[in-house]
A protein has these predicted regions:
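C-terminal intrinsically disordered regulatory tails that are low-complexity, acidic/proline-rich
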Residues: 7, 20-21
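Bacterial N-terminal signal peptides that target proteins for export
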Residues: 1-7
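Low-complexity, intrinsically disordered segments exposed to solvent
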Residues: 22-255
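C-terminal motif of bacterial Sec signal peptides marking the signal peptidase cleavage site
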Residues: 15-18
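Sec-dependent N-terminal signal peptides
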Residues: 7-13
Length: 255
């Protein structure tokens, strides 16, 4: 009888081990946790940020160039205080460019004056739509910006920009075809400084928030800070990871 009981117990243990092996080897757990940040890595988010910053993808640097060009022309256009001026631009990349883009932009500019009716600052609002394709990611998006440009007086050495840039649309990764979905980007700019007369970016800062959704994988979210340098780059810190963004080419370098 003792041997019979031991045989039954051994059979049960072997059966349990076999079931467990089959479950672990071939059957996924039904309550498995979603992939962290929907599989969108910090590097992926940095590519999105780069596209929202650089000149060749209708980023903040491009918009800053447009609005300060308009600000520089105020003395020649004799724009009246409080009057809204509209401007529409269609912009495409050059043939054969490594980064391709096509955007339609509609600007509204209003000159703000002091109590003596002298130009004080320029308010700009923008709505845009289009697409770009970079080395690692492609995006179709639309968005807006509201920027105020200070430093209109001829004696001021710099143009100073404060405001917000927003983008919403869809993205596709070129390095992993499984990574595609929707994204939203919000950049709040503070003291973005462009040196006169060439209007090169020489300083300023910003905060950035990137969020979105990947079908069947869930949501992702990243936040960070941006420091605009005086050498054509910006330092992006995203969830603690530091990158250098080339504001002309959009190329990112991780540190």
């Amino acid at each position: 009888m003792k041997n019979f009981k031991l045989s039954i117990m051994a059979m049960l243990l072997v059966g349990a081990a076999a079931c467990n092996k089959t479950y672990n080897g071939t059957t996924p757990k039904s309550n498995s946790a979603p992939t962290a940040n929907a599989g969108v890595s910090t590097d992926d988010a940095a590519d999105m940020a780069s596209g929202s910053l650089s000149l060749n993808s209708n980023g903040v640097a491009n918009v800053a160039n447009d609005v300060t060009l308009n600000a520089a022309s105020v003395p020649n256009t004799h724009q009246a205080c409080g009057i809204v001026k509209a401007d529409t631009i269609s912009r495409q990349s050059a043939s054969g460019a490594s980064v391709t883009y096509s955007y339609n932009l509609t600007y509204s500019f209003m000159l703000l004056c002091d109590t003596s009716n002298h130009p004080d600052s320029l308010s700009s609002s923008l709505i845009y739509s289009g697409s770009y394709s970079g080395p690692n990611i492609s995006t179709t998006n639309s968005g807006s910006s509201i920027f105020t440009v200070g430093g209109l007086l001829a004696s001021a050495p710099d143009f100073i920009i404060n405001g917000e840039y927003k983008s919403a649309g869809s993205f596709k990764s070129k390095t992993d075809t499984a990574k595609n979905g929707s994204n939203n980007i919000d950049i709040v700019v503070k003291g973005l400084t462009l040196k006169k007369p060439g209007r090169a970016i020489v300083g300023g800062s910003a905060t950035i928030a990137i969020s979105g959704d990947v079908p069947k994988k869930g949501n992702f979210s990243y936040t960070g800070t941006i420091v605009f340098n005086n050498d054509g780059t910006a330092t992006l810190t995203l969830n603690g990871t530091v990158y250098t963004i080339n504001l002309y080419t959009g190329v990112k370098t991780r540190h």
